[in-house]
From Swiss-Prot:
Reactions that this protein is recorded to catalyse: 2 (2R)-3-phosphoglycerate + 2 H(+) = D-ribulose 1,5-bisphosphate + CO2 + H2O; D-ribulose 1,5-bisphosphate + O2 = 2-phosphoglycolate + (2R)-3-phosphoglycerate + 2 H(+)
Keywords assigned by UniProt, alphabetized: Calvin cycle, Carbon dioxide fixation, Lyase, Magnesium, Metal-binding, Monooxygenase, Oxidoreductase
Details of cofactor binding: Binds 1 Mg(2+) ion per subunit.
Chain sites annotated for binding Mg(2+): K194, D196, E197
Family named by the database record: Belongs to the RuBisCO large chain family. Type I subfamily.
Transmembrane helix listed as a keyword: no
Residues with the N6-carboxylysine modification: K194
Organism: Acidithiobacillus ferrooxidans
Needed co-factor(s): Mg(2+)
Name of protein: Ribulose bisphosphate carboxylase large chain 2
């Protein structure tokens, strides 16, 4: 048996963590980082340093390396690629053995992959672009509490996108007036109304009163329309204990769905809440507040496609996904990529949409993408084309800003939605022919006609900051 020797001192990371000949294993967790190295840092040294700091390494050789099988547990930088059109940075591909991570813990995964390594002096900027989770790891995670098909069965709604509305103004309404706004929207044709991300339990509207008035609105709207209705009751709270208290009360009063801010609320809390929803028959809507702090800078942070994968593992039945056409930025091809990541069982590598790895979700349910942010009836043809049926199209100002009130705004959106779905089903290219489709529908809907006149000049044409690096195929 060979005797292990220990040589103290500082070594180049590439001597241990750069392995260009490594054969990736099916069980490895794979990550691709965009690295902007400091001046003078070698092209192979920088990714090796990232692999070391995000797995087993430290700044110097330590004698306790001899007490474990370092070669088994270490992360390995195995490939480098140029970033098209940007010679200041490059892509580095790193493989991590699955045993580095606690089963079913996205918290532990992120602690390694986006932990201390992001403050590493060897790199000037670092961005996690994509992660491949092996099926062996996927199966240790609970995932969405119910998924798309179960939600459709619970709500008894099929064959079209679901229609929602975020109540505005997002802050300042009393609980009674808030409930009235929900009722008007639901009776007008919405499937869901929604708390905004920062509606928790403030002095102007405590959570219990809001829950009570909203549930009264749901029940009244259901009785009038004969349709199942819901409202995303935000249970995000200062502590997990308070969060579960609010969730339990929502269940007690008969609410079908609750809501959580998964980034500001925390991944640990989110996974626990998803497990609770699965056990208690509650749907879980997820808001992504704070995501742009992490994902907007094209050189530093975490790409949103990674945040979607983490959410699918942690658990949520809905996730805000951008709109492409509204007030919030989002590249079309990239958005289509992460919509597939949220919904599909298997997603192939597709650099034209920013997808670096095949991703197999096995039997894990999908997440319903939610389009929300500055959208109105004129956007409906594009939204139905981009998102398809398994989505929620959520109009806040585009409902509540209707000149005739909330119910009429909801009716306008419902007519526009059903007209677009019907035209699409007849084979009409609705994104191209959308104006004609809406104009024809408006002949029989004064609510839609007024909505079209109100928002015909409203556009959001600012360029996207975070663009795809690769040329479209």
């Amino acid at each position: 048996m060979a005797v292990k020797t220990y040589n103290a001192g500082v070594k180049d990371y590439r001597n241990t963590y750069w392995e260009p000949d490594y054969s990736v294993k099916d069980t490895d967790i794979l990550a691709v980082f965009k690295i902007t190295p400091q001046a003078g840092v070698d092209r192979e040294e920088a990714p090796a340093a990232v692999a070391a700091e995000s797995s087993t390494g430290t700044w110097t050789t330590v004698w306790t390396d001899l007490l474990t099988d370092l070669d088994y547990y270490k992360g390995r930088a195995y490939r480098i690629e140029d970033v098209p059109g940007d010679d200041t940075c490059f892509y580095a591909f790193i493989a991590y053995p699955i045993d580095l991570f606690e089963e079913g813990s996205v918290v532990n995964v992120f602690t390694s992959l986006v932990g201390n390594v992001f403050g590493f002096k060897a790199v000037r900027a670092l961005r996690l672009e994509d992660v491949r989770f092996p099926i062996a790891y996927v199966k240790t995670c609970g995932g969405p509490p119910h998924g798309i098909q179960v939600e459709r069965d619970i709500m008894n709604k099929y064959g079209r996108p679901l229609l929602g509305c975020t109540i505005k103004p997002k802050l300042g309404l009393s609980a009674k007036n808030y409930g009235r706004a929900c009722y008007e929207g639901l009776r007008g044709g919405l499937d869901f109304t929604k708390d905004d991300e920062n509606v928790n339990s403030q002095p102007f509207m405590r959570w219990r009163q809001r829950f009570d008035f909203v549930m009264e609105a749901i029940q009244k709207a259901e009785a009038e329309t004969g349709e199942r209705k819901g409202h995303y009751l935000n249970v995000t709270a200062p502590t997990p204990e308070e969060m579960y208290k609010r969730a339990e009360y929502a269940k007690e009063i008969g609410a079908p769905i609750i809501m959580h801010d998964y980034i500001t609320g925390g991944f640990c809390a989110n996974t626990g809440l998803a497990n609770w929803c699965r056990d208690n028959g509650m749907l879980l809507h997820i808001h992504r507040a704070m995501h742009r702090v992490l994902d907007r800078n094209p050189h530093h942070g975490i790409h949103f496609r990674v945040l979607t994968k983490i959410l699918r593992l942690s658990g949520g039945d809905h996730l805000h996904s951008g709109t492409v056409v509204g007030k919030l930025e989002g590249d079309r091809e990239a958005t289509l990529g992460w919509i597939d990541i949220m919904r599909d069982r298997f997603i192939k590598e597709d650099r034209s949409r920013g997808i670096f790895f095949d991703q197999d979700w096995g039997s894990m349910p999908g997440v319903m993408p939610v389009a929300s942010g500055g959208i109105h009836v004129w956007h409906m043809p594009a939204l139905v084309t981009i998102f398809g049926d398994d989505s929620v199209l959520q109009f806040g100002g585009g409902t509540l800003g209707h000149p005739w009130g909330n119910a009429k705004g909801a009716a306008a959106n419902r007519v526009a939605l059903e007209a677009c779905v019907e035209a699409r089903n007849r084979g009409v290219a609705i994104e191209k022919e959308g104006k004609a489709v809406l104009t024809e529908a408006a002949k029989h809907s004064p609510e839609l006609k007024i909505a079209m006149e109100t928002w015909k000049e409203i556009k959001s044409e600012f360029d996207t900051v975070d663009k795809l690096d690769v040329a479209h195929k």
